[in-house]
Amino acid sequence: MDNNYALPPSGRTPVWRHITKAAKSGDFILQVCQACETVQYPPRELCKDCLQDKLEWQKLSPQGELISHTNLHASTNAFFRRYLPRKIALIKMDCGPIIFAHIAYSDAKTGDRLTIMSKRDLSGEGVFIALTDLIEANVQLDQLNKLLLQD
């Protein structure tokens, strides 16, 4: 039997390490191009708009609007198969980009305002968690902690 099922996949790009570091304190950070001020997601080495390499990590507003969500009912990864179905979402951030996040509140609807929190998953990598203000954050996080969060 393969014992690798115990943890979520840990492969991320080296650029992602900044998000993992920020997740220790729960900060929401993204790269901002110092040449054209475009906020970047996903993290990258060159600006998606002007191709400059002047990207700086900044703490940004964690607020956004839910634009799409779905329940995952299948996975090719053994770890995630144990925790299906799971809700994931696309959130249009007030600071600009659309990000992918795990969503903690199962009744969230398109158009709902959400707050993004950085957390570490069981492999120690940073992930984004979308929370609603309709329910206490600790209640929402308890559901995800059982599944995939370290802290």
Protein language model annotation of sequence segments:
Residues 1-28, 122-139:
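A broadly conserved sequence feature marking short terminus-proximal activation segments
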Residues 27-30, 44:
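Residues immediately within or flanking Cys/His clusters that coordinate Zn2+
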Residues 41, 54-56:
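Short functional micro-motifs and their immediate structural scaffolds
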Residues 64-67, 103:
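Conserved hydrophobic positions within beta-strands
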Residues 32-35, 46-52:
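Short, cysteine/histidine-rich loop/knuckle motifs that typically chelate Zn2+
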